[in-house]
Each structure stands twice: as C-alpha cells, then as structure tokens.
C-alpha cells in the first residue's frame, strides 16, 4: 500500500517475519560509496547485500550490522565521504533475560532469600564481587575456581568459574569499566571494538548486557564495603549502588527492560 506523508509517497508492506530475520535500510550515500575513489559506479545494492550476508552471524546485533556497513562505506570513500550515509538495521529476536547479582544484603539473614530469588530467574546469571560470589557458592554448595588469566585487559581482575553461574567477576573495578563502556555506547564515543572482542570480565559483562540481553534484572545488596566508600556520597550510599543506577540509565537508553531489586 502507499500513502502520502509531507508530500512524499510512502510504500508500506506487511508480511510475516521469523526469528533472526534482519531488515536493512540505507540512504543513497551507501550506494554512492566509492564513486571517484575505489569504485567507478559506487557500491551497488547487490554488492551491499552480498557484503551483509557474507558478514552476518546469528549473534550479531542490529547495531553491529549497521555499523559494519557504515564502516565499509567509509573505507570505500577512503575516509572522505561525498554524501551523508545512514544505515538502519532491525533484527527479529526472542526476549533474552540476563540476571546480575552484586553485593551482599544489608541484613545477612536475607542472603538465602536473595539467592533463592536470583537463581529462580530464567536466563543467564552473572555474579559480581568476592563476598557475593562466596555467598552464591555457599548457597549452591559449589566452589569458585578463579582464573589465573587476566584476559586482554590486565587492569580488570580475573574472572572466576562456578557451576550454576554463567560468569563470576570482581565487583567495583569491573563494573566501573562496564559503566564506562555503556556511557561510550550511548553517547557516541563507541568502544565496541574493545569490549566486543576482549575476554576480561568487564568486556564479557558488556557483551551479555549490551548485545545478548533484552531484559536485565539486577539483584543488589546494600551492605557497605568501607573500602569502596566515596567521601562525596552519603555514608549509607555505596559506590556499587551508584554504579548500578548509572548503568541502568544507560541500558534503558539502549532499549533494555530493566528491573532493580535491593536487599
């Protein structure tokens, strides 16, 4: 069907879709890419389709797919685009929850309740913090095996491994880096080229929260670690709480559904 909007003829199509279907729209700056540079006649639509299909993996986010095409356009323009180039991508996917646990509860007697609620949730499980991971290990009657490999970023403490948990990491240092990545993601100074390929704990959390998850449940303990207090914050307000609040705001701007539960 067609209709007129602001003097423009808009063509509309309605059709069934399946999971992992991808829709890509682009301005003519994409098809002009390379004119006067690498390609005499620009980057033809058929060639863009071939490029998108050749570089597609089922786990690729819509942002990654669109960014990959834009990067190739910039390469064909040799860094000097002759036209504005916009690419939009939509990927059809099921909702995928991720649950993140950080910090022991303010009242130690609430630990079992906190763990029961956390481990009853559907989806992947991330546990952050040494004390928190030990509480989780006691609840599951499992042991934590800490990796001796710092991954690709030696500034981030090593991850751990525990049966029943998808990812075990250190707390404040790791989460601070995740917030840094989230801020860059939202504000346009994107660091995806770092966290999307690195193997440290912060990068793995970023991959799960930014790319994999659609719904994120935070389970946050309000016990205060004196080593992490900031003199600019009230004594009852831990740094981890501020980190989670800031991260939640960035994740919501990414379109994620966020729920935060405090204990």
Predicted ranges, named:
Residues 109-140:
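Active-site beta-strand/loop microenvironment that shapes enzyme catalytic pockets
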Residues 25-27, 128, 219-221:
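Short beta-strand segments
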Residues 29, 85, 129-132:
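Conformational gate/switch positions in structured elements
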Residues 6-8, 116, 127, 158:
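Residue-level signal for the start and early helices of compact helical domains
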Residues 23, 79, 124-125:
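Residue-level marker of motif borders
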Residues 1-35:
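Acidic loop->beta-strand submotif enriched in PP2C/PPM serine/threonine phosphatases
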Residues 19, 31-116, 142-146, 150-156, ...:
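C-terminal catalytic subdomain
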């Amino acid at each position: 069907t067609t209709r007129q909007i602001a003097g423009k003829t808009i063509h509309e199509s309605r059709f069934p879709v399946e999971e992992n279907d991808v829709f890509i729209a682009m301005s003519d700056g994409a098809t002009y890419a390379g004119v006067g540079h690498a390609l005499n006649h620009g980057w033809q639509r058929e060639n863009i389709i071939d490029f998108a299909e050749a570089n597609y993996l089922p786990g690729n986010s819509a942002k990654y797919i669109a960014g990959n095409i834009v990067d190739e356009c910039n390469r064909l323009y040799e860094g000097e685009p002759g036209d504005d180039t916009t690419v939009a991508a939509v990927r059809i996917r099921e909702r995928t929850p991720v649950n993140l646990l950080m910090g022991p509860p303010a009242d130690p007697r609430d630990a079992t309740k906190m763990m029961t609620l956390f481990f009853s949730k559907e989806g992947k499980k991330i546990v952050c913090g040494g004390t928190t991971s030990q509480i989780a290990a006691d609840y599951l009657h499992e042991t934590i095996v800490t990796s001796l490999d710092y991954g690709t970023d030696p500034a981030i403490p090593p991850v751990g491994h525990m049966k029943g948990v998808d990812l075990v990491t250190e707390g404040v240092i790791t989460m601070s880096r995740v917030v840094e990545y989230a801020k860059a993601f939202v504000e346009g100074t994107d660091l995806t080229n770092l966290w999307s390929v690195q193997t440290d704990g912060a990068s793995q959390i970023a991959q799960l929260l930014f790319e994999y998850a659609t719904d994120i449940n935070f389970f946050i303990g309000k016990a205060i670690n004196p080593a992490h207090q900031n003199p600019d914050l009230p004594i009852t307000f831990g740094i981890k709480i501020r980190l989670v609040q800031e991260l939640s705001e960035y994740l919501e701007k990414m379109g994620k559904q966020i729920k935060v539960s405090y204990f």
